[in-house]
Swiss-Prot record:
Mn(2+) binds at D146, E148, E217. InterPro entries: DXP_reductoisomerase, DXP_reductoisomerase_C, DXP_reductoisomerase_N, DXPR_C, DXPR_C_sf, NAD(P)-bd_dom_sf. Its cofactor is Mg(2+); Mn(2+). The gene is dxr. Gene3D superfamilies: 1.10.1740.10, NAD(P)-binding Rossmann-like Domain. Pfam families: DXP_redisom_C, DXP_reductoisom, DXPR_C. Catalyzes the NADPH-dependent rearrangement and reduction of 1-deoxy-D-xylulose-5-phosphate (DXP) to 2-C-methyl-D-erythritol 4-phosphate (MEP). The keyword Manganese applies. HAMAP family: DXP_reductoisom. GO terms for molecular function: 1-deoxy-D-xylulose-5-phosphate reductoisomerase activity; manganese ion binding; NADPH binding. One of its GO terms (biological process) is isopentenyl diphosphate biosynthetic process, methylerythritol 4-phosphate pathway involved in terpenoid biosynthetic process. Pathway: Isoprenoid biosynthesis; isopentenyl diphosphate biosynthesis via DXP pathway; isopentenyl diphosphate from 1-deoxy-D-xylulose 5-phosphate: step 1/6. It catalyses: 2-C-methyl-D-erythritol 4-phosphate + NADP(+) = 1-deoxy-D-xylulose 5-phosphate + NADPH + H(+). This is 1-deoxy-D-xylulose 5-phosphate reductoisomerase.
Length: 380
């Protein structure tokens, strides 16, 4: 039985992870977890899964829960996340928290020798060089939870990675894929949160609509698979059936197909290289799709993706700036402070004023992250 440490238990990925664990109680046990501010859902999870250690964000929530669950050890804040991530009895850390707050817990868990299932893409975006270096030193593999990177991992099984021609990441195009740039000036938060194919959290859904999410995934793929940015291509695949592909030097492609359900990549990360049965509401039949459609990305229509490629190629602290600026800009949009089409402008502004620092250490990354957030907040 694998003992799971789950960060971000009440979020979209966390909820679907718990569904998998619920279906397979003989294979998985939640021994520690974290959640943010959703106390109602958090209480229910603690009652059902009976973790031994829990981290919440606020001190007041920790105090409240300590009185309700005297047999559980509680922590709070970032230090609480770090305590939970390194819980001695845990085998696997599944990091599903949103944002750069997931970086330090991941590094701590690697240092503690935990297996890592990574859904927090910001960890690799902001500090990929540090994370991959630490994982190599500890002989730990980072198993991706993102559907696209899980697809690449599966496509590369048994293959010689030196024979990769390119990685092809697929994208749905998001909520506004058929709107012009001019039409984006009028879109609402409610409209932006209606993703055509996937059920995701709010921030991720907005990132999908701007395609910053795909840009972060490009950087994540660069670090996970050691592929140059020029050899990572993004294509629009409207049906979200082909989750990603690998092209090899002989011209052949290997693709991973499946229903757009995050339980598949989550479970694969937990059972790799094994697979388990997943009960779907509707069986996936390839014959239900008379055609699959592919489109080139229009970088004028999706400037966020171009910004992400630029940040990745510049390297150093520039990806940290892009990520931090985007997090603040998206929060501003969700709070009604920023128009949707201004999200990219805020990120570009932050990048233009920053001179990248090469091969940054952890303290430098954290400092640049905080400085960028503070700057973008002044623009809201």
């Amino acid at each position: 039985m694998k003992k799971i440490i789950l960060l971000g238990a009440t979020g979209s990925i966390g909820t679907q992870t718990l569904a998998i664990i619920r279906e397979n109680p003989e294979k998985f046990q939640v021994v520690a977890l974290s959640f943010g501010r959703n106390m109602e859902r958090g209480r229910a999870i603690i009652k059902e899964f009976k973790p031994k250690m829990v981290a919440v964000w606020h001190t007041r929530d920790r105090v409240t829960l300590e009185a309700e669950f005297p047999n559980v050890k509680f922590f709070n804040g970032l230090e609480g996340l770090r305590e939970v991530a390194t819980y001695l009895d845990g085998d696997v850390l599944l990091n599903a928290v949103m944002g750069s707050v997931g970086l330090l817990p991941t590094l701590d868990a690697i240092e503690a020798g935990k297996a890592i299932a990574i859904a927090n893409k910001e960890t690799l975006v902001t500090a990929g060089h540090l994370v991959m270096r630490a994982a190599k030193e500890k002989n730990i593999s980072l198993l991706p939870v993102d559907s696209e990177h899980s697809a690449i991992l599966q496509a590369l099984n048994g293959e010689n990675t030196e024979r990769i021609e390119k990685i092809v990441l697929t994208a749905s195009g998001g909520s506004f894929r058929d709107k012009t740039r001019e039409q984006l000036s009028l879109v609402t938060v409610k409209e932006a949160l209606k993703h055509p194919n996937w059920n995701m959290g709010n921030k991720l859904t907005i990132d999908s609509a701007t395609m910053f999410n795909k840009g972060l995934e490009v950087m994540e793929a660069h670090w996970l698979f050691g592929v140059d940015y020029d050899d990572i291509e993004v294509v629009i695949q409207r049906e979200s059936i082909i989750h990603s592909m690998v092209q090899f030097v002989d011209g052949s492609f290997i693709a991973q197909l499946g229903t757009p359900d995050m339980r598949m990549p989550i479970q694969y990360a937990l059972t790799y290289p094994d697979r388990l049965y997943i009960p779907y509401e509707k069986e996936f039949r390839i014959t239900d799709f008379s055609a699959l459609h592919f489109e080139k990305v229009d970088y004028e229509r999706f400037p966020a993706l171009k910004l992400a490629y630029n940040a990745g190629k510049i390297g150093g602290t520039m990806p940290t700036v892009l990520n931090a600026a985007n997090e603040i800009a998206v929060a501003g949009f969700l709070n009604g402070q920023v128009a949707f089409y201004n999200i990219e402008a805020l990120v570009e502004n932050a990048m233009n004023r920053h001179t990248s620092i090469s091969d940054p250490d952890l303290d430098t990354i954290l400092q640049v992250d905080q400085e960028t957030r503070a700057y973008v907040k002044t623009l809201l």
